[in-house]
Amino acid sequence: GEYVRLHLDDRSTITTLFRLKNMEAALPSEMFMRVHRSYIVNLQRIRSYVKGRVFISDSEYVPIGENYREAFQRYIEAHYQNL
């Protein structure tokens, strides 16, 4: 198995024995998107997108994986004007 670490709004974390692929399938796709082989982001928490990075706060970001970049870019273009 694999461990998945969930980062919560209050900066706490929960670690669970779960495959990221299964977590991705369980989460609502209109709210979460896989952006890297190691990361799923809450789309409502995106602050900005700069040079292959999704910022979820002013200083915290996750990288966009090459295999996920095109789908993420399509999402951004469809949902955000000023991001």
Predicted regions and their residues:
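Conserved binding/recognition cores within well-folded domains
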Residues: G1-S57, Y61-P63
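Eukaryotic intrinsically disordered, low-complexity regulatory linkers and tails enriched in Ser/Thr/Pro
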Residues: N67-L83
